[in-house]
Amino acid sequence: MRNLIQNRWLKTGFLLLLVLFVATVAQAAEPLPLPSLNIGVGASSKPSDMAVTIQIFLLLTILSMAPGLLIMMTSFTRIVVVLSFLRTALGTQSAPSNQIILALAMFLTFFIMSPIWNQINQEAYQPWKAQQITQQVAMDKAVAPVRKFMLSQTREKDLALFVSLSKLPRPKNADDIPTLTIIPAFMISELRTAFQIGFLIYIPFIVVDMVVASVLMSMGMMMLPPVMISLPFKILLFVLVDGWGLVISSLVKSFG
């Protein structure tokens, strides 16, 4: 009994010494420096400081709008709508998934738009980086290839619609049309073209559905859903004709 009490006291004393040692080491250790961040509004003696601040703010705004610009001013809209039509026509519900469709549409957009982005890099960004042109000139040269691409894919009817809605004077040429007027007209034209391609994609799959439904009715199998039977045949047909290659090549070639 006496040995048990002594062992308990020894354990308690050892724990107290350990706690005191850790506390002493913690006090002796140098405190970690904490970073400080000061945000304030002060007077500036140079007008250029204000200009740089505005430029940074505009740059952050453009970066936050990058997904919207990708959708509005590139081939992304047509591609993602056509791929969605393809999935619906096949009847595969969630295969391929939305993530796969968006990723494929994004990289196809990079592939299609790469000549335009290379032109922007060579004619606008690199000269501006080398301080050969001003920032305003660089912006004008960067917008020009994008405007040319959008105008080449926009119907005159859609363009005339938004020019009339904006109540602007009749433009003499394409350079007189504001970019904010071209963008919605371009998107409407892209949706129209995507729906036309989607209609062509639907036709062979509808034929397969009709044939399967007719066969089931002739066999008296009224209660069996035709979609469940036709799905394997539609997938087989799509694979045999190299459907992915045909759809992707048609999409890329549709942009000329």
Predicted features by range, described:
Residues 1-29:
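N-terminal secretory/membrane targeting signals
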Residues 2-4, 29-256:
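Hydrophobic alpha-helical segments and their helix-loop boundaries in membrane
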